[in-house]
Amino acid sequence: MKRISILGLAVCGAVSLWAAETDTGGLDVVQVRPNFYMIAGAGGNIAVQIGSDGVVLVNSGAAAATDQVSAAIKKLTSLPIRYVIDANADADFVGGNEKIAKTGFTIFTNALGNAGVAGTMTNGGAASILAHQSILNRMSARDAKPSYPGDAWPTEAFLQNRKALRMNDEGIEILYQPAAHSDADSFVLFRRSDVVVAGDVMDMTRFPIIDLANGGSIQGEIDALNKLIDLTIAPTPYIYKDVGTYVIPGHGRLSEQMEVVDYRDMVVLVRDVVADLIKQDKTLDQIKAARPALPYETRFGTQPGVTNSFIEAIYKSLTAKK
């Protein structure tokens, strides 16, 4: 294998960026921990945990990148994919569910010989797709855009705010975050690896996309970011020796607690400025013209329309009738 340099993805020397000698299909594979990787460039960021039980993925990426994702995982390990955990319902996170799951193998091997339960309990012998019920609701809706085949839907859905399992000698928690980026967001915490997969609650490439039409809200976004901060630990007191909890955002580079704090503070500050302008009876157009996110536009507002979308989402969220 050879080491490659990818600008902006490594946050410190403890993170290695590796590519196999053969082509990685344009994807960036970041070694986060000895048995933990992040795959970037396939839509939303994908987390890969590897151990004796097999492979656990968080997110499957965009449908168009499925073959490249499968190839990248095979270069990391020959072990089968056992679980695909969905962190949200957006197409760039769940688009690869069907094909990726079918490259894996169920953990419920005792049911494979029973035709009455094999199709549901074992996902037809494929890897299980695990997600909060809100994600299943979004993906299976008649008017879902894009529409998803049934084999892409979660095969195990849970209603409670917390789902826990143990794979590869590690506790894994899936923590539902209501009304944040949307109504279908979850954090996935890997306890021993000390990694949190945040989905699009945190996006290091732009202002957060708050999907009001699908249940998102500015207060829910802030609440979720506060929860994310609580889940992370800074590398104190040995800040020059160790690293703290790693956070895999929905898009962009690997992060740590301080970057989550900065992102939360940015969201709160812009929210507060918009709220103050609303109190002054400013219209949405007037608020946009005032550029309340100006201090952060060069960092998070370079994509077309993203700043106005963020301001509009804050305005509509704050002025919505209770």
Predicted features along the sequence, with ranges:
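Active-site metal-binding motif and surrounding structural segment of the metallo-beta-lactamase
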Residues: 52-56, 64-115, 125-127
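Divalent metal-coordination and catalytic microenvironments
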Residues: 35, 49, 59, 73, ...
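Accessory terminal helices/loops
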Residues: 14-20, 106, 236-244, 253-322
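Metallo-beta-lactamase
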Residues: 21, 26, 31, 54-56, 60-64, 116-180, ...
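Conserved beta-strand hairpin/beta-sheet module of binuclear metal-dependent hydrolase folds
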Residues: 27-74, 186-199
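Bacterial N-terminal signal peptides
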Residues: 5-16
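Intrinsically disordered, low-complexity Ser/Thr- and acidic-rich flexible linkers and loops
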Residues: 106-123, 234-242
